[in-house]
Amino acid sequence: MKIAFFTEGNYQGKVNRNNVNMRTDLAWICALKADHWNINQKPDQKYDLGIVIIPKNNPQFEIRHLKLYCDKVAVMQEGPNWYWQDYPLEQQIWYFNTIQEADQMLVHNEIDKKYYEGLTGKKCKILPSLMIEDSIDGLKTTPRNDRDGVIIGGNFCSWYGGFDSYIVATYFECPIGIPSMGRKIVGEENMENLNHLPYMNWVDWIHALSKFKYGVHLMRTHAAGTFALNCAYLGIPCIGYQGLDTQMICHPSCTVELGDMESARKIAEKLRKDEEFYVYCCNEAQDGYGSNFIEPIFMEKFFNG
């Protein structure tokens, strides 16, 4: 099958397996040996399937243009399933009509599948998050005794729930790391015992993550779930919320109901105090990753699932 992805990315062609910025969208393109085109470009060839990731900040896209070059067109969910309802009304209607015109809707999680099937009346398909391991091979065997500290998955805003994650992380009684991201707010650097990682590419991020012993990501905004997935690949237990497939599949013993800070705190304390439970959760995470998210399983699900 000849596949093309259409996104707001300003590049054209294939994605090399050693790309240092191999986030999930690039991993999909790489694994499927697809071509990438900017969403505004006109391809110079025909495709069996075109997958379009409609930009969150520019949803007024017309699928009929892609149907000139692609036998079938699928829309890939971008962001949480409710995001589009913050658009002005005319853009909400435009987005709804766009996904109705698509031949297929691809989504992140089981809950998203139920949402979009109910919204559109069409069958939807989960496109699981993916890691291309070529550039990080060997990191998942990092000895656990060499790991220290807890890392939280996002900054201090409602989108990431960083303050909630920070409070739970304090119960590990160890240094707390946090990535520097686009929603970092003024004053974060003054929080006690909180160390910001510098901005870095994906490969450097996985290397940095591999040095931590625990993860906390109490993010209410459910989408691709890459933080939980990255932790699982490395065998790092990650405390997070239900509703995110990567969290629930790879870290079931560390998953809590939305907003259940009390249970999250208790899990943090148990991971710190109970070595047997910690090792169990490490193994559970890597087993969940290996049984559900490795590249061969992704390919099987995509073409035959």
Where on the chain are the PLM-derived regions?
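Membrane-proximal helix-turn-helix segments that form the acceptor-binding/catalytic region
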Residues: Y87-M105
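Acidic donor-binding loop of glycosyltransferase active sites
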Residues: S210-A223, I236
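Active-site proximal beta-strand in glycosyltransferases
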Residues: L49-I54, R64-Q85, L106
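Donor nucleotide-sugar binding/catalytic pocket of nucleotide-sugar-dependent glycosyltransferases
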Residues: D103-Y115, G121-G138
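Conserved catalytic-core segment of nucleotide-activated headgroup transferases in glycan assembly
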Residues: V15-T24, E133-N190, H196-W202
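A charged, aromatic-enriched C-terminal amphipathic alpha-helix characteristic of glycosyltransferases
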Residues: R272-G305
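N-terminal pre-catalytic "stem/leader" segment of glycosyltransferase-like enzymes
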Residues: M1-H65, Y115-Y116, I239, S253-L258, ...
